[in-house]
């Protein structure tokens, strides 16, 4: 298969490694990738786990209200006398029987709609919640329940709270999660049906990954044969190298699918944030902006000096290099600053990152890994980064400008609403670009 990149044009400092990298790129992209293998249709769950949990909660609603009602029937009289008074001689002002029927109504409607017919719309639960809320408000205003016993408070309040919990769970968990799973599945199918394009120039470093010294790629088969530079020796080091290459392959795929990027928002400086669904990794955020400086300057500031980034990048509070595996691969430890006005607390990350130089771009790609020197710390929630990175593209017409791309796929863990995470990530990316521009201006002033 012919290569889409002419590596003979690369600078003389990296010819051998560049040629190895070209062969690796062809091989890795011509074979099925684990990130783009769709689930066979026969193996897809017809009933999602989150929907099954919702149906179980609806059943709990009915059983819990029934149990409370039975307890209420046994408080003052025998259960049979109480049943006769509340059912046969039903009175709206004094009977709890209608609250039990309300629970039965919710159970039947929700189980039929979301278990039997597997609806993917909120209209059924909107009806049940509206009916429940209206009935309970009328019941509380017009009835004499509060003069009887504690159950005059317990049953209406419990029924009201459980009904709204069901609404929240369906709207924010079931429907959202199933829609995301469906998008991921369709993206996987589309990726499997289309031939993987060969990647051209690959740029810079990763969203939460601050990168290693200047070097290029090598073939894994040649790890033990290279005679120059640092090389991976142990099995763990070779595993780090493999992870770095996997992340690099995914970032390359993302770069070739720019026409599929979904525009999200922009700022006054023209920076734009896009999103793309990545099979088995979910939503990936992509920041793209133009910088008034050379690509080499960004390469030096963002990729080659990660420890110094904390001096000018306020979105990061800690950045340490835990291990330099080889000339292209390193393991880093990063702590992000809080976001969304403190709602999102600081997270720490352990990432493996791979850096490669190309004729017209620089790339640093990485993903989450584990390292013995940084176990989980009780002070931070340990986040997990999917494949992502920084990319710096040189301009063929004007060497004094460059295009900067940040690919960010991260799971912040914790119990945070997904919409809040997405908003905070986009804001953090714009903030990073602001700090980067300020740093570039400071460097330009110091050079004068």
From Swiss-Prot:
Keywords: Endosome, Lipid transport, Lipid-binding, Membrane, Phosphoprotein, Transmembrane, Transmembrane helix, Transport
Domain called START: residue spans: 232-445
SUPFAM superfamilies: Bet v1-like
PTM field: Phosphorylated. Phosphorylation allows the tethering of two membranes that participates in the formation of ER-endosome contacts. Phosphorylation of FFAT motif drives membrane tethering between the endoplasmic reticulum and late endosomes that in turn allows the efficient transport of sterol mediated by the START domain.
GO CC terms of this entry: endoplasmic reticulum-endosome membrane contact site; late endosome membrane; organelle membrane contact site
Any GO BP: vesicle tethering to endoplasmic reticulum
Residue ranges of domain MENTAL in the record: 47-219
Catalytic activity: cholesterol(in) = cholesterol(out)
Pfam families cross-referenced by the UniProt entry: MENTAL, START
GO MF annotation list: cholesterol binding; cholesterol transfer activity; protein homodimerization activity
Sequence intervals crossing the membrane: 53-73, 96-116, 122-142, 150-170
PANTHER family in the record: STAR-RELATED LIPID TRANSFER PROTEIN 3, STEROIDOGENIC ACUTE REGULATORY PROTEIN-LIKE
Role: Sterol-binding protein that mediates cholesterol transport from the endoplasmic reticulum to endosomes. The sterol transport mechanism is triggered by phosphorylation of FFAT motif that leads to membrane tethering between the endoplasmic reticulum and late endosomes. Acts as a lipid transfer protein that redirects sterol to the endosome at the expense of the cell membrane and favors membrane formation inside endosomes.
Family the entry assigns: Belongs to the STARD3 family.
Record comment regarding domains: The START domain mediates lipid-transfer between membranes. It contains a hydrophobic cavity able to accommodate one lipid molecule, thereby serving as a 'hydrophobic bridge' across the aqueous gap between donor and acceptor organelle membranes. The MENTAL domain anchors the protein in endosome membranes and exposes the START domain in the cytosol.
UniProt name for this protein: StAR-related lipid transfer protein 3
Naturally occurring in which organism (per UniProt): Danio rerio
């Amino acid at each position: 298969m012919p290569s889409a990149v002419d590596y003979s044009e690369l600078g003389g400092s990296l010819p051998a490694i560049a040629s190895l990298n070209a062969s690796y790129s062809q091989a890795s992209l011509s074979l099925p990738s684990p990130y783009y293998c769709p689930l066979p249709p026969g193996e897809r769950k017809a009933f999602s786990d989150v929907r099954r949990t919702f149906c179980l909660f609806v059943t709990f609603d009915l059983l819990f209200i029934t149990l409370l009602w039975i307890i209420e029937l046994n408080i003052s009289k025998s259960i049979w006398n109480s049943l006769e008074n509340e059912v046969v001689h039903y009175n709206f002002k004094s009977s709890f029987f209608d609250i039990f029927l309300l629970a039965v109504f919710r159970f039947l409607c929700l189980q039929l709609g979301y278990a039997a017919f597997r609806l993917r719309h909120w209209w059924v639960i909107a009806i049940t919640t509206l009916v429940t809320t209206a009935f309970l408000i009328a019941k509380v205003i017009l009835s004499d329940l509060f003069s009887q016993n504690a159950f005059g408070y317990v049953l209406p309040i419990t029924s009201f709270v459980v009904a709204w919990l069901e609404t929240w769970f369906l709207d924010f968990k079931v429907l959202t999660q199933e829609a995301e799973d469906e998008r991921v599945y369709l993206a996987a199918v589309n990726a499997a049906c289309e031939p993987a394009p060969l990647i051209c120039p690959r740029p810079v470093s990763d969203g939460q990954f601050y990168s290693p010294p200047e070097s290029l790629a090598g073939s894994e088969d040649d790890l033990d044969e290279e005679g120059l530079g640092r090389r991976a020796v142990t099995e763990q080091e070779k595993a780090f190298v493999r992870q770095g290459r996997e992340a690099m392959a995914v970032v390359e795929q993302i770069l070739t699918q720019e026409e599929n990027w979904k525009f999200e928002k922009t700022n006054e400086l023209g920076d734009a944030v896009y999103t793309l669904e990545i099979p088995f990794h979910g939503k990936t955020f992509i920041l793209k902006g133009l910088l008034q400086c050379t690509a080499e300057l960004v390469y030096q500031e963002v990729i080659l000096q990660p420890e110094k980034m904390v001096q000018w990048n306020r979105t990061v509070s800690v950045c340490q290099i835990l291990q330099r595996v080889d000339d292209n691969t390193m393991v880093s430890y990063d702590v992000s600053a809080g976001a969304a006005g403190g709602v999102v607390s600081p997270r720490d990350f352990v990432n493996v990152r791979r850096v490669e130089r190309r004729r017209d771009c620089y790339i640093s790609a990485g993903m989450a890994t584990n390292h013995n020197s940084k176990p989980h710390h009780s002070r931070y929630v340990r986040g997990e980064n999917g494949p992502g990175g920084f990319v710096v593209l040189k301009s063929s017409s004007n060497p004094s400008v460059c295009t900067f791309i940040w690919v960010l796929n991260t799971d912040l863990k914790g119990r945070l609403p997904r919409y809040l995470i997405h908003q905070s990530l986009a804001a953090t990316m714009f903030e990073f670009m602001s700090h980067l521009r300020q740093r570039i201006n400071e460097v330009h002033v110091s050079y004068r």
